[in-house]
Amino acid sequence: MTTIYLIRHAEADGNLYRRAHGWYDSVITDRGYRQIAALAKRFASTRFDAVYSSDRHRTMTTALSVYKTHGLPLVTTPRVREIGIGVWEDHPWAELERTDGEQLERFNTDAAHWHVAGGEYLPD
């Protein structure tokens, strides 16, 4: 039987500062590096055949916790990136709530019908 582990990236500066980061290439925080160390410990005895990551710094760095300790290559692809959020990239969530609250509500509740300038549209 095949087992697939989905691991969210460790804390990045966008999480810490509550900024909108989809394709924006944010960096891992000190807390994020501690989370990566904990992941490495958690998965130390787990067998992996492959490790995939998006091509964003925060995801590749988080994937270190698995691929490096298991001697595996890291396969990166933009096809597994978070959704691109266009003109919202690197703006504080609180600002977006004030300036584009209706679209933000749709993003949080009905992403299949959400779209913002320069961002991805899920049905595409």
For each of these PLM feature ranges, what is it?
Residues 70-124:
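Phosphate-handling substructures
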Residues 1-5:
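Extreme N-terminal starter segment of soluble prokaryotic enzymes
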Residues 7-72, 76, 99, 120-123:
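Active-site-proximal alpha-helix that buttresses catalytic centers in soluble enzyme cores
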